[in-house]
Amino acid sequence: MNEVERTLVIIKPDAVVRGLIGEIISRFEKKGLKIVGMKMIWIDRELAEKHYEEHKGKPFFEALIDYITKAPVVVMVVEGRYAVEVVRKMAGATDPKDAAPGTIRGDYGLDIGDAIYNVIHASDSKESAEREISLYFKPEEIYEYCKAADWFYREKKQAKC
């Protein structure tokens, strides 16, 4: 079965100010994933609290809100087969010190004493992805299009994208 999914990715403020946007996007595209929605925004407190509502009341909540609202972010809708799982694996463990080399967080995340800068958010489930995408994107901001190589990977040679 062709499990094409969509997931939300946020390139966080630390990655934006360190000039890592292109590198991170490139990794997803090289993996064969498709960016079907993308924009740069500055997340305000209200949106941050909606996004991270499941963490409200936890000791790290305020630091998380401060972190995600500190500078602009790039939000993306990424599409592909098993996109949620694939993107999570590419992102690596939440804590950069636990993230394997070769993952985005393993290569670019920083653990600075009492703060971690893990450069990227990736939805943790299909349900979370749907909820998170709807927070950042209107339906008309997500695009259907064919990549140049899509025809090559189709099961039938004459299949159209």
UniProtKB/Swiss-Prot annotation:
Phylogenetic classification of the source organism: Archaea, Methanobacteriati, Methanobacteriota, Thermococci, Thermococcales
Name of the protein described by the UniProt record: Nucleoside diphosphate kinase
Protein location: Cytoplasm
Record-stated family: Belongs to the NDK family.
Any one GO BP annotation for this protein: UTP biosynthetic process
Gene (UniProt): ndk
Organism: Pyrococcus furiosus (strain ATCC 43587 / DSM 3638 / JCM 8422 / Vc1)
Predominant location: cytoplasm
One Pfam family, short name: NDK
NCBIfam families linked to this entry: PRK00668.1 (NF001908)
PROSITE patterns reported for this sequence: NDPK, NDPK_LIKE
Cofactor: Mg(2+)
